[in-house]
Amino acid sequence: MNAPAMTSDRLVLREEVLGSRRFSNIWWGTVAAIGGIGFLLAGLSSYLRVNLLIVSDTSQLVFIPQGIALLFYGIAGSALSLYLWFTIILDIGGGYNEFNKETGKVTIFRWGFPGKNRRIEVSYPLADIQAIRADIKEGLNTKRKLYIQLKQRREIPLTRVGRPISLSELENQGAELARFLGVPLEGL
C-alpha cells in the first residue's frame, strides 16, 4: 500500500492516518457478506424445503442438525459482515496527526464509534514534546510504531493500527518528524 499522505509547509506538518477503509477490510467484508448470505439461504432452504440458492439444491438437507448449523453460520457471517461494513463506512480509526508551529500545538485526531466519543481529538503544546520514539520488535508478531514522547513520560502513538509499515518508511517518517519538531529520534 502507499505511504500515508504527509503534507508540509514550513509551519504545519499534517499526516493523514488510514483507518478502517483499507482494502483488506473491504475484501473480508465482501467475502463475509457473500458467505454469510449463502449459508443463511442454505439454512432457510433446508427449513422451508424450497431451493433459495442458484448454485446448489439444499432443500433436501435435514433441518436438524445440518440446516440449523448452516443457519447459525449464516447469521454469524452476516453479523461479521455488517460490523465490518459499519466500521468501513464510519472510517473508524481514520484521522490525522497535525504539528502546527503557528499555534504551537500538536493535534491527534481519530474517528471513533458513534456516541459521545465519536470525535477523538487530543492536543498538546509542541513544547511538551521531548522526543519521537520508534518502537521496533521483529519476530512472529512484528511491531513497528512511532510515538510522541511527552514531558509527563506519556507516549502517544502516531502510526495506524493494522499492517506494520516498512522499516525504511518508519525511519523516514520518524526522521522527518524529528527534524520538523527539532527533537531527537530515539529507538533506531
UniProtKB/Swiss-Prot annotation:
Keyword tags: Membrane, Photosynthesis, Thylakoid, Transmembrane, Transmembrane helix
One example of a Gene Ontology biological process annotation: photosynthesis
Membrane topology of the entry: Multi-pass membrane protein
Compartments where found: Cellular thylakoid membrane
A Pfam family recorded for this sequence: Ycf4
UniProt entry tagged with the keyword Membrane: yes
Listed GO CC annotations: photosystem I; plasma membrane-derived thylakoid membrane
Main subcellular localisation: membrane
Membrane-spanning intervals of the chain: 26-46, 70-90
Similarity comment: family membership: Belongs to the Ycf4 family.
PANTHER family, A to Z: PHOTOSYSTEM I ASSEMBLY PROTEIN YCF4, PTHR33288
Record function comment: Seems to be required for the assembly of the photosystem I complex.
HAMAP family assigned to the protein according to its UniProt record, in alphabetical order: Ycf4
Record's protein name: Photosystem I assembly protein Ycf4
Taxonomic source organism: Rippkaea orientalis (strain PCC 8801 / RF-1)
Lineage: Bacteria, Bacillati, Cyanobacteriota, Cyanophyceae, Oscillatoriophycideae
